[in-house]
Amino acid sequence: MSNVSIINKERKYFNRNRLINKNKEEFKSELLEYARSNFKDQISDFSEASLGGMLLDFAAIVGESLTYYIDQQINELNYETAVTEHGLLQHIRKANLIGGFASPSSVIVDFLILVEADTENKELPNKDYLPIIHKETGMTTNSGVNFILSEDVDFQNNYKIIETTTTNNRDYLLLEKSGIATSGNISYESFSFDLDEEENFLSYTLENENITRIIKVEDNDSFINEYYEVEFLSQDTVYEKVKNNKEVYFNVRPAPFRYILERDYEDGLTTIRFGNANNQINEDGLLTNPEELSLPIKSRDYFSNISLDPKNLINSPSLGVSPVGKTITVKYIHGGGQDHNILARDIAEFSSLNYSFPNLENVDADAIVVINSMSITNKNKAVGGTNPLSLEELRSAIPTAMKMQSRIVNHEDLLSRLYSMPSDFGRISKASILDNSNTKNAKDLFVICRDLNSNYVNASDALKFNISNFINEFRIIGDTFNIVDAKVFNISVFLKIKISSNYDSSTVVTDVKDKIFTLMMFEKLQIGESININKIIKIALDTPGVLTISSNFKNVIRTKNSSNNISSDRTYNDNSFSSIENYEEGILYSPRGGIFQLKYQEDIEVITG
């Protein structure tokens, strides 16, 4: 019976690119021809059972073996033809590919608390008893999956009042606020490095698999130095979140104590690798001065080759401070997989609750009542959890990873950076880049955000400050961006249709409204994107019962603002545009740096006539 493993290896060998396309028999044939032409007087018998045949077999086997290893080494240089796990993992590391571990799922968790009403205004809660639920609060599900709160849930503002109730002649408000949670478990590990440790760039492999995030790394020094994760050890700055007066700012700070992560996709483990400087903090942020390595030339006008220790070039504070002789404590989150994609309303209770009352000096009995009234749930199912990628899946991802760059070269690079900015520093909803008509050296970056009701709002000064600092680390020298608020133009849709006598008018009108709202997908419009009026007309004409459209196409989309608002329960901004001047051949173009918004579905008006 054939060995399946050997057969598979042979199949891979013969199917791959081969530098020397010869097997044993071909080597033997050439050797036989060479022996007969050069050693015919010494050996004349080269049959299988003869001494000459044995020598030919030996030489052919050696030739085939050498060919195999040459082909193997050549093929291992290419990620597409590499067959060994070690070689493929090396290509994955060179490509700086990340994300091959099991990923956690994410879900929006709703927090509900019961707070006593304010004594002066019964419609508002007593602000002294509005808590902050801090990030890293633990939650667990009915199915046994743990979740961790990723951001602070601050009830001081932007809460939602669900209902009011009265108990024992005291008025209470039921408040709701949401926060993002990700699946996983928080673990701690401590390890020490000896003072006489001679290894360069000390490292330690963490015990748990599928580590998704390192929360904190610090040592036992008297100053308790915190180590920061960087992409490579020569990167000496990191982003730091600074909270000032309830605004979050994004600063860039030096990181003399830093580390990189090395991921082993074969066993799912993560290794932390530190710098190699001798516990010295780099003051100027420069690499080792080459002048320190220069050798003086005395009493002669020539020099010979002199051996230098390469460590002198890398033993620099610019590559990070070494933790030699210290104890390191690591706090991290691990875990993930498809089974972490829990169903709706599966999150049941807290596993650990971290909270504070910023308006109270001491937590009293009433504050404890507020905490005890707290409940949590997830209205939607969790998404994003995936199992670890196989080596073949990682191989296919190498080309994309190799094309990634750390610089903003074109508009697509800038938009990708903006949308991937850490959520701790704010989220933008839409962004667009346009040339500045006044100068060729600057671009206008238009941004817009959303509030809790999914309405467009201008970005805060803190968010603009964060964006400026964030893109400054990636932009090419000479590139200038003006961060500008995108103008929001509230619109309404007006259609006058003629309906067939065989159909109910109210039903057809409702169908037209619903189809326009569903198929046009106004909420997906980008900054500067136009509206296809012809598409709206086609949607209406395709609705059963509609005979003709009698509206002027230039007036199908109209400005909706505070001056022409006749409904007291709707609010609009003051921006306006000319639907006639911006209309051309069935397309309504947005003003420069503007975005259209259909704020209410009721703003789709369809009449008959």
Q: Which residues make up each language-model segment?
A:
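Signature of Asx- and small-polar-rich beta-strand/turn repeats characteristic
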Residues: 1-609
